[in-house]
């Protein structure tokens, strides 16, 4: 008997199943298909020819064997394998049809996302302020490209999972659970049928009184102990497959609950709005230009628009700016290096502070002029 076609189908099921499903498939192939094909055929090949009765009445042995085994053990197990694998084969056909119907653009997009490399980071050079101060008659680039080193994000994207997320993403979860339920029902049904037909033991002799036997005759079975052991093994394999089906259902249920909780927690985290962070050295530059309530004076700020700086504050700012400018001029005269001077002017904290205070002064003057015009009207 050839099992190649069924084996190829079961191998395709392995690509669309969970980790527990792969274990079930291994048990099915090794302990059911191979064991039934190899061990069953060799053990039960002479089950009827070696079934002898202590009579020479024609037809009596055939009738007694039919009463002893209404269905051959091997044929029963082959029929069991076919019915149990039918839901999985139907699921495989549906999965292949569902995946084939997906748009080609979506498939190409997924492949492009996997194979896409990170684009280089383009930004303004960090040392451009200092390079501009160089008088080397060379044009410095305004932007520079920096290739970001490959991180272990691919490992994070390729999280090790047992195929449950892939089944869910392909929209096959309901069909997968349905075929698990059918498999479990078939397992229970065949376990009960095997017990009703054969029990847990192959008896060494069978008493038969059917027609056309002239009287009650005793019939003897070949290798009853070996057949009993093989029968118990098939009981254990069926129970193991049923247990794996129940474990897989439990695993899918727990995984679905975890995904729901994780999605809810992610939505809560996304709903919390984070305050925008200021650029580097922003607060250090504007720390002197704060209002009495602690907010910086900045155009567009609703609080600063209604704030008018007093006259004595304006005078104090003018004096401070004048004094700071004198200190800077004195420092520049003492240091004749134009490069250092230009770099100091462009990047020194004092120059940044003076620029910020000058902006404050201009803003305050504009506010004062505007308020005087309104009062004059």
Swiss-Prot record:
Any single GO BP term: cell-cell signaling
Compositionally biased intervals (Polar residues): 344-362
Pfam families: Connexin
Chain spans, region Disordered: 129-163, 266-286, 341-377
GO cellular component: connexin complex
Extracellular side: 40-75, 198-228
Keywords: Cell junction, Cell membrane, Gap junction, Membrane, Transmembrane, Transmembrane helix
PROSITE patterns assigned: CONNEXINS_1 (PS00407), CONNEXINS_2 (PS00408)
Regions of compositional bias (Acidic residues) in chain numbering: 131-151
A GO MF term: gap junction channel activity
TM region(s), chain numbering: 19-39, 76-96, 175-197, 229-249
Main location: membrane
Domain of life: Eukaryota
Ranges in the topological domain labelled Cytoplasmic: 1-18, 97-174, 250-377
Membrane-topology descriptor: Multi-pass membrane protein
Function: One gap junction consists of a cluster of closely packed pairs of transmembrane channels, the connexons, through which materials of low MW diffuse from one cell to a neighboring cell.
Family label: Belongs to the connexin family. Gamma-type subfamily.
Assembly notes: A connexon is composed of a hexamer of connexins.
Protein known as: Gap junction gamma-1 protein
Organism: Xenopus laevis
Name of the gene encoding the protein in the UniProt record: gjc1
């Amino acid at each position: 008997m050839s099992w190649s076609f069924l084996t190829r189908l079961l191998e395709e099921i392995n690509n669309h199943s969970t980790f527990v499903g792969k274990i079930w498939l291994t048990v099915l192939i090794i302990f059911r298909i191979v064991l039934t094909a190899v061990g069953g055929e060799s053990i039960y090949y002479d089950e009827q020819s070696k079934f002898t009765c202590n009579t020479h009445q024609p037809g009596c042995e055939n009738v007694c064997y039919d009463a002893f085994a209404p269905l051959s053990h091997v044929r029963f197990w082959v029929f069991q394998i076919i019915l149990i694998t039918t839901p999985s084969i139907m699921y495989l056909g549906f999965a292949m049809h569902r995946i084939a119907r997906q748009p080609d653009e979506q498939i190409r997009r997924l492949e492009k996302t996997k194979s896409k490399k990170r684009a280089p980071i383009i930004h303004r050079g960090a040392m451009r302020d200092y390079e501009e101060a160089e008088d080397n008659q060379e044009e410095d680039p305004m932007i520079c490209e920096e290739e970001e080193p490959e991180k272990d994000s691919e490992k994070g994207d390729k999280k090790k999972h047992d195929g449950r997320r892939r089944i869910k993403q392909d929209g096959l979860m309901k069909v997968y659970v349905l075929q698990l339920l059918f498999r479990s029902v078939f397992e229970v049904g065949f376990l009960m049928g095997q017990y009703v037909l054969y029990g847990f033991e192959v008896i060494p002799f069978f008493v038969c009184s059917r027609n056309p036997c002239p009287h009650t005759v005793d019939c003897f079975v070949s290798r009853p102990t070996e057949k009993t052991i093989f029968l118990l093994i098939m009981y254990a394999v069926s129970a193991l497959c049923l247990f794996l089906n129940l474990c897989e259902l439990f695993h899918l249920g727990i995984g679905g609950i975890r995904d729901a909780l994780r999605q809810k927690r992610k939505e809560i985290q996304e709903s919390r709005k984070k305050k925008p962070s200021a650029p580097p050295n922003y607060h250090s530059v504007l720390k002197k230009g704060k209002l009495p309530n602690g907010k910086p004076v900045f155009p567009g700020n609703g609080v600063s628009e209604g704030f008018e700086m007093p006259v004595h504050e304006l005078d104090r700012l003018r004096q401070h700016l004048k004094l700071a400018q004198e200190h800077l001029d004195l420092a520049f005269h003492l240091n004749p290096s134009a490069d250092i001077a230009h770099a100091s002017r462009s990047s020194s904290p004092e120059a940044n502070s003076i620029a910020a205070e000058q902006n404050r002064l201009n803003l305050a003057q504009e506010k004062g002029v505007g308020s005087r015009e309104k009062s004059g009207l």
